[in-house]
A protein has these predicted regions:
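Extracytoplasmic/secreted envelope proteins and their assembly/folding machinery
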Residues: 7, 57-61, 168
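Conserved C-terminal helix/tail region of periplasmic/extracytoplasmic solute-binding proteins
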Residues: 111-177
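Mature extracytoplasmic/periplasmic domains
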Residues: 43-140
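Sec-exported extracytoplasmic/periplasmic mature domains
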Residues: 1, 8, 15, 62-70, ...
């Protein structure tokens, strides 16, 4: 079975398939893939230049970006946040809770998330999950792709109407063969 979908939807699909006793994996073609991230933004000068609305928007972004609220949002929507937590380890601990191996798990492998949670070399080994070997190509790889996957991926761009038509035709051909 082949399906193209957002990584969060892929995780949801894998979770639902498990309920039926099926094990699906997540893969990114060697040729590359789209990179995407979800985050909040606001207009530089607020809404219609209104200082109070700008302050309200900033307060909302600050609130939703707090690590405790990031975790609530990730839990609810099933997607990884653009927020890594700053000085807080809460989001990494949540990733460990979601994907880390149980203490009695025998076949585990390290899954390095340092690129996401830290830029400092001195914390290189601090952000490594021990995951069940089966998880390395499943949910954790969909939520936190390895750096090798990120290097062969590109941020999506807006396409013209003609480019959208060509891309839609391409996907129809993929589905038909």
């Amino acid at each position: 079975v082949l399906n193209m979908q957002w990584s969060g939807d892929g995780v949801y699909t894998m979770d639902e398939a498990e309920k039926d006793g099926l094990e699906l994996s997540y893969a990114v073609p060697e040729e590359g893939s789209n990179l995407w991230f979800d985050g909040f933004c606001m207009m530089k000068n607020g809404i219609s230049g209104d200082a109070k609305k700008k302050q309200a928007a900033q307060a909302f972004i600050n609130y939703i970006s707090r690590p405790d609220n990031v975790i609530r949002n990730m839990y609810y929507v099933g997607y990884t946040s653009v927020i890594a937590g700053g000085d807080s380890d809460l989001i990494f601990k949540y990733a460990d809770w979601c994907y880390g191996a149980e203490e009695d798990e025998e076949e585990v492998s390290p899954y390095d998330l340092s690129y996401f949670f830290s830029g400092a070399k001195e914390t290189k080994n601090k952000y490594v999950l021990e995951v069940p070997k089966s998880q390395a190509s499943r949910q954790v790889s969909a939520q936190y792709p390895k750096q090798s996957v990120l290097k062969r991926s590109a941020v999506m761009q807006c396409f013209s109407e003609e480019a959208n038509r060509r891309i839609s035709r391409m996907w129809i051909r993929v589905r038909c063969f």
